[in-house]
């Protein structure tokens, strides 16, 4: 019953997109099942609507926020921390060529926006995930 409603909703979105000369990209379309612990009762195969098909994913990205199956935000924090430390590693290659104040300004301008983006979805995270984000702030300072 519920799966047929989801399929009908996706079909309606695809029809609307077609009528507005837009195309649903099969390669970029993903979905997750947001349910209780009874996930084993959900279909694990993809759904097909016309030529469109999608399979359930363990993590999806929407507006730059990574949402995982259990809504724990672990994947979002992991990717954010990884991206920030990668930026810091790149900045360290020029550390000796620029004055300290310029380096600090660059680090602040290039790293902290990653932490600030969508930080309201991070409210109420476990302490372990907050510590990982704080380690980025400490490394940037």
Language-model features: locations:
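Hydrophobic/basic alpha-helical segments
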Residues: 1-141
């Amino acid at each position: 019953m519920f799966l047929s409603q989801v399929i009908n909703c996706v079909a309606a979105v695809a029809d609307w997109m077609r009528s507005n000369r837009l195309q649903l990209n099969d390669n970029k379309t993903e979905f997750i099942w947001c349910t209780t612990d009874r996930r084993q009762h959900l279909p694990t195969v993809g759904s097909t609507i016309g030529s469109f098909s999608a399979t359930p994913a363990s993590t999806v990205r929407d507006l730059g926020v990574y949402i995982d199956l259990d809504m724990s935000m672990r994947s979002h924090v992991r990717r954010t921390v990884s991206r920030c430390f990668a930026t810091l590693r790149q900045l360290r290659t020029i550390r000796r060529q620029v004055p300290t104040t310029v380096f600090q300004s660059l680090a602040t301008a290039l790293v902290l926006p990653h932490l600030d983006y969508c930080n309201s979805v991070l409210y109420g995270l476990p302490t372990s995930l907050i510590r990982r984000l704080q380690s980025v702030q400490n490394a940037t300072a």
